[in-house]
Amino acid sequence: MAFAVLLDQVGSLGRFQILQLAFLCIANILLFPHILLENFTAAVPGHRCWVHILDNDTVSHNDTGTLGQDALLRISIPLDSNLKPEKCRRFVHPQWQLLHLNRTFSNTSEPDTEPCVDGWVYEQSSFFSTVVTEWDLVCEWESQKSVVQSLFMAGSLLGSVIFGYLSDRFGRKMICSWCLLQLAISDTCAAFAPTFSVYCSLRFLAGSCVMTIMGHSFLLVIEWTNPQSRSMVTTLLLCASSVGQMLLGGLAFVIQDWRTLQLTVSIPIFVIFLSSRWLVESARWLITYNQLDKGLKELRRAARINGKKNAGEILTIEFLRSAMQEELDAARSQASIFCLFHAPRLRMIVLYLGFVRLAVSVPLYGLIFNLQYLGRNIYLFQVLFGAITATARFVALLVMNYMGRRISQVLFLLPVGLFILVNTFLDQEMQTLRTILATLGAGVLCIATTSGSVHFSELIPTVLRGTGGGINILFSRIGAALAPLLMIFVGFSPYLPWITYGVFPILAGLVVLLLPETKNLPLPNTIQDVENDRKETRKVKQEDNCMKVTQF
């Protein structure tokens, strides 16, 4: 924890940290659209069966007389229960007699129908083309659309664990750069995918990178900043993700061809990858892993950018060894993923944080699915949701700095549960009130998740922060997968899934109370920092290190 002393020497929030933060914010803005891309590239437009008499360009007007499109549609496509044209069936033969019958007249004999053996005709008012129209993922193949999102989520789950572990072994910058390259290549190739299976495979590879890059961007910022600034930089990075949501809505509105949209959001990632060479590795991680020469080099680089001219004389190998002696001694025993669950206090923290992340993800994704019924303009909704979450992030910053990490989460998690429970029992006709409550719930959940992200980074030690982040994302992905599965309970009661969504954040709020407060405390570097009485240990060490700095 003596790294705070080193930060004071090089500048804990100067030009260096601002430049690093600005670059990673831009990266997050360009990265987040890749997570929600299937909202547009895999959207399902209105469709019906292809009909020879209606859609064959070689059929002359003389063959159909003076009949208009509506009349031809009526004799070719049966109506569903809502008196809308069927999406997956057509008449075997044109039913001319229907032209002389009232729509609601029930005939004694039902005309023969058949599946869409000749394909489908798609509406192009909202989407010119999507992967659904490209490979006809409708009707009996409709479930294939969810395969893309499931594989992307599976890739995210697997990548967060693997790359999280590797980042604790080989550094944040190296893994972040590799993931940027992998994402750029895989999603660019996805724009030219010849088959649906190839497209799914490429999106799986992309999914394994996106959350890893975003998670490591937090590490590369918070491990270079002082305790007072961590909540602010975390909030700014999360706000960048919200801006990315709004950017995606605007791009998708302008570019309605899925391949062009896929390519448009993928090419800039190559630029981010090439620019990542100027990222500075976490000196905290380098020193904790006994790479003193490299750590000293990065510290001097940060001091030079921050204008700390005298820092070069103070920052020496001997000074690093003296200030970080306890951390260096602890680094001799290599930490592994098993250490997260071996040390009793750390195990308790990891499990509590994991449950909170899971319990927040379940209602968050449940509300996202519900918010999609705000209207038919999906582009406007995407921009609106980004604006709501961005506003919520700034509210979170104010509350965190005033009330601390723990109380701020409890303050917002409990009302979320109440919003959902009240919404569950409101009459379906009260759409305006239901929409307001759902939107408030989503915004308040974003406040809680922002505070939770800061809380997590301040509880897990540096030697395992990447691995711990992977485990935390794993719990988040499990919660995201549970959200739609809970709708199975509708078969027992239409209220049961929503009651479950409401109970989860209430339980999460109670569990947060079991976690220690971390406001304005230095980051733990080793497992011993977490296991010991942290507040007392930190106070003594800071006083001792101040004496060492004075001596130098």
Swiss-Prot record:
Gene3D superfamilies: MFS general substrate transporter like domains. The chain crosses the membrane at residues 16-36, 146-166, 174-194, 204-224, 235-255, 260-280, 349-369, 380-400, 407-427, 436-456, 473-493, 495-515. Keywords: Cell membrane, Ion transport, Lipid metabolism, Lipid transport, Membrane, Steroid metabolism, Transmembrane, Transmembrane helix, Transport. GO terms for cellular component: plasma membrane. It catalyses: estrone 3-sulfate(out) + glutarate(in) = estrone 3-sulfate(in) + glutarate(out); 17beta-estradiol 17-O-(beta-D-glucuronate)(out) + glutarate(in) = 17beta-estradiol 17-O-(beta-D-glucuronate)(in) + glutarate(out); 5alpha-androstane-3alpha,17beta-diol 3-O-(beta-D-glucuronate)(out) + glutarate(in) = 5alpha-androstane-3alpha,17beta-diol 3-O-(beta-D-glucuronate)(in) + glutarate(out); dehydroepiandrosterone 3-sulfate(out) + glutarate(in) = dehydroepiandrosterone 3-sulfate(in) + glutarate(out). GO terms for biological process: monoatomic ion transport; steroid metabolic process; sterol transmembrane transport. It comes from the Eukaryota. GO terms for molecular function: transmembrane transporter activity. InterPro entries: MFS_dom, MFS_sugar_transport-like, MFS_trans_sf. It is found in: Cell membrane. Renal transmembrane organic anion/dicarboxylate exchanger that participates in the reabsorption of conjugated steroids, as well as bile acids, driven by an outward gradient of dicarboxylates such as glutarate or succinate. Transports androstanediol glucuronide (5alpha-androstane-3alpha,17beta-diol 3-O-(beta-D-glucuronate)), estrone 3-sulfate, and estradiol-17-glucuronide (17beta-estradiol 17-O-(beta-D-glucuronate)), but not taurocholate. Belongs to the major facilitator (TC 2.A.1) superfamily. Organic cation transporter (TC 2.A.1.19) family. This is Steroid transmembrane transporter SLC22A24. It comes from Microcebus murinus (Gray mouse lemur).
